[in-house]
UniProtKB/Swiss-Prot annotation:
Tissue expression profile of the protein: Epididymis and vas deferens.
Protein name, per record: V-type proton ATPase subunit d 2
Family indicated by similarity: Belongs to the V-ATPase V0D/AC39 subunit family.
Keyword Transport found: yes
Cellular component, GO annotation: apical plasma membrane; early endosome; endosome; membrane; plasma membrane proton-transporting V-type ATPase complex; proton-transporting V-type ATPase, V0 domain; vacuolar proton-transporting V-type ATPase complex
A molecular function (GO) term: proton-transporting ATPase activity, rotational mechanism
Species for this entry: Rattus norvegicus (Rat)
Family matches, as InterPro entries: ATPase_csu/dsu_sf, ATPase_V0-cplx_csu/dsu, ATPase_V0-cplx_dsu, V-type_ATPase_csu/dsu, V-type_ATPase_csu/dsu_dom_3
Pfam families reported in the protein's UniProt record: vATP-synt_AC39
GO BP terms in the entry: vacuolar acidification; vacuolar transport
Entry keyword annotation includes Nucleotide-binding: no
Gene behind the chain: Atp6v0d2
Free-text function comment from the UniProt entry: Subunit of the V0 complex of vacuolar(H+)-ATPase (V-ATPase), a multisubunit enzyme composed of a peripheral complex (V1) that hydrolyzes ATP and a membrane integral complex (V0) that translocates protons. V-ATPase is responsible for acidifying and maintaining the pH of intracellular compartments and in some cell types, is targeted to the plasma membrane, where it is responsible for acidifying the extracellular environment. May play a role in coupling of proton transport and ATP hydrolysis. Regulator of osteoclast fusion and bone formation.
């Protein structure tokens, strides 16, 4: 017998869950990837993609076809799917979808601010923004000279407003301060999203909390790695770490003191989930830390579909689709640049 919560889930969200599971079934198979890596030109790639769920998404693109055009059209297709889910959702799933868009909004804001710093035209930078993170006030981002101005002039009416409470500063937004702002926003965002999922309870919490814990720890590890050799102090580094992961609190304290990659690896070795990831870095495959993180993320998101009656399938599908898109872009770049030796270095999903 289904529990009451599960019965209610099906009444409110069962249609969309069935739909997203159907979408997941249309992800590229291993045989599709075998066919893609054999393509000689981007036009060949386009023809093969037409035989998959991507269909004729490039039909209106005139020659010459570029990797950038393929990437843009794939993003638009994903955005159309996401908008359909979101527009047909009821609360609290609607709020869950809003949380999902916040990470893209943060990336878009940072992209626009860096563009303004480099005196690029707003139109040029907007074209590079992710469609899932678009909002009406975006074009005004370039008028802000400090985090406080950015909040008051642009973000106060957006879903990002609550995450700005720890980021208020009158400091001029130079390149370093913009990067610090990105990490502080992500920290607040992940902690809030984690709390939302945990408070929701049921299977959504059981599936989403481990996924967000991993994302929080991944950010802490990548921030640490990227801070080596920079002017970022150890104290400032620690303030950027999300506190909703498995590394909190002791692991984060040790990471803040790390001097190099080996020191960082020793911290990770204390955690059963992260030791094998660090052990897999390098080796014969030449994998980077980012590669092994992506592989682990794919595994977790595939497993999310083994459970029913939860919101995690929507998050997992978007993440798996994004990895698929990265794979296609990687293969397309190798074909375009005639650099086929690493064409198989994509991350399989199914």
């Amino acid at each position: 017998m289904l529990e009451t919560a599960e019965l209610y889930f099906n009444v409110d969200h069962g249609y969309l869950e069935g739909l997203v599971r159907g979408c997941k079934a249309s992800l590229l198979t291993q045989q599709d990837y075998v066919n893609l890596v054999q393509c000689e030109t981007l036009e060949d790639l386009k023809i093969h993609l037409q035989t998959t769920d991507y269909g004729n998404f490039l039909a209106h693109e005139t020659n010459p076809l570029t990797v950038s055009k393929i990437d843009t059209e794939m993003r638009k297709k994903l955005c159309r799917e996401f908008d359909y889910f979101r527009n047909h959702s009821l609360e609290p799933l609607s709020t869950f979808f809003t949380y999902m868009t916040c990470s893209y909004m943060i990336d878009n804001i940072i992209l626009l601010m860096n563009g303004a710093l480099q005196k690029k035209s707003v139109k040029e930078v907007l074209a590079k923004c992710h469609p899932l993170g678009r909002f009406t006030e975006m074009e005004a981002v370039n008028i802000a000279e400090s985090a406080s101005e950015l909040f008051k002039a642009v973000l106060v009416e957006t879903p990002l407003a609550p995450f700005f409470q720890d980021c208020m500063s009158e400091n001029t937004l130079d390149e370093l301060n913009i990067e610090l702002l990105r990490n502080k926003l992500y920290k607040s965002y992940l902690e809030a999203f984690y709390k939302f999922c945990k408070d929701h309870g049921d299977v959504t919490a059981e599936v989403m909390c481990p996924i967000l814990e991993f994302e929080a720890d991944r950010r802490a590890l990548i921030i640490t790695l990227n801070s080596f050799g920079t002017e970022l102090s150890k104290e400032d580094r620690e303030t950027l770490f999300p506190t909703c992961g498995k590394l909190y609190p002791e692991g984060l304290r040790l990471l803040a003191q790390a001097e190099d990659f080996e020191h960082m690896k020793r911290v990770a070795d204390n955690y059963g989930v992260y030791k094998p990831l660090f052990d897999a870095v390098g080796g014969s495959g030449g994998k980077t830390l980012e590669d092994v993180f992506y592989e682990r993320e794919v595994q977790m998101n595939v497993l999310a579909f083994n459970r029913q009656f939860h919101y995690g399938v929507f998050y997992a599908y978007v993440k798996l689709k994004e990895q698929e898109m990265r794979n296609i872009v990687w293969i397309a770049e190798c074909i375009s640049q005639r650099h086929r030796t690493k064409i198989n270095s994509y991350i399989p999903i199914l």
